[in-house]
C-alpha cells in the first residue's frame, strides 16, 4: 500500500493550492514563458494525506510530510510539476516535452496510480526516472492521457528503422 491517500482533480491554475500556484507563476515569469493562463492546456492537483502509522515507525523514519500538494501543468512545450509538503517545502520541476517520455501507471500492490516520467528535466545532468503519484479518480487518467498525447505530438516517434544511423537495409535502401 502507498503511504498516502491521494485525491486528484482537474482544475484551473487559479484553483491550485497557493504555494503551487505561486511557484508556477514565478517559473513562468523567470523563464518568460508567456501568460500562464493562456499557455496552459491542462492543469490538475493531487492532495496526498499521510496514512496513520505507529509512533515507532514515525520515529525511525523521521518527520515526513503529513500532507503533500502536487500540481501538474501542461503547455504545448512544457510539463511542469510542483510539490509542496508541510515539512519539505516547495519543489518545482519542469521538462521540455521533446526531452521526456511518460507512461500511465496503475499498480495494485502498492495501490497507486499516476504518471511515470523518464528523460531530462530542466537542470538535470543526467536522465531521470520517477513517478508523480495521483489518486484513483477519472481526472488522473484524463490528465495522464493529455500529457502522453502532448509528448507524442511534440516528439513523434520515428517510423523508419535505423541501424547505426543508416536506414534499415544499408545505404540507399529503406
Model-derived regions: residue spans:
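Anionic N-terminal interaction surfaces
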Residues: 1-72
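Hydrophobic, Leu/Ile/Phe/Ala-enriched alpha-helical segments that form helix-helix packing faces
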Residues: 24, 28-32, 117-119, 147, ...
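Acidic/proline-rich low-complexity IDRs
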Residues: 32, 127, 133, 163-165
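Short, surface-exposed polybasic-and-hydrophobic patches located at secondary-structure transitions
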Residues: 111-131
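Short amphipathic beta-strand/extended segments with alternating polar/hydrophobic composition
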Residues: 92-97, 126-136
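Generic structural motif
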Residues: 100, 120-122, 135-137
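Phosphoinositide-binding peripheral membrane targeting modules
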Residues: 56-114
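Terminal and domain-flanking low-complexity segments
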Residues: 18, 135-174
Amino acid at each position: 500500500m502507498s503511504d498516502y491517500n491521494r485525491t486528484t482533480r482537474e482544475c484551473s491554475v487559479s484553483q491550485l493550492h497557493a504555494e503551487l500556484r505561486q511557484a508556477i507563476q514565478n517559473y513562468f515569469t523567470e523563464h518568460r514563458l508567456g501568460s500562464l493562463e493562456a499557455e496552459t492546456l491542462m492543469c490538475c492537483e493531487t492532495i496526498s494525506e499521510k496514512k496513520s502509522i505507529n509512533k515507532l515507525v514515525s520515529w525511525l523514519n523521521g518527520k515526513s510530510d503529513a500532507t503533500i500538494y502536487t500540481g501538474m501543468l501542461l503547455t504545448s512545450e512544457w510539463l511542469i510539476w510542483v510539490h509542496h509538503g508541510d515539512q519539505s517545502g516547495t519543489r518545482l520541476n519542469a521538462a521540455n516535452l521533446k526531452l521526456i517520455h511518460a507512461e500511465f501507471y496503475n499498480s495494485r500492490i502498492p495501490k497507486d496510480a499516476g504518471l511515470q516520467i523518464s528523460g531530462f528535466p530542466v537542470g538535470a545532468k543526467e536522465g531521470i526516472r520517477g513517478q508523480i503519484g495521483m489518486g484513483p479518480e477519472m481526472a488522473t487518467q484524463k490528465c495522464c492521457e493529455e500529457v502522453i498525447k502532448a509528448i507524442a505530438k511534440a516528439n513523434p516517434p520515428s517510423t523508419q528503422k535505423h541501424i547505426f544511423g543508416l536506414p534499415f537495409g544499408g545505404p540507399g535502401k529503406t
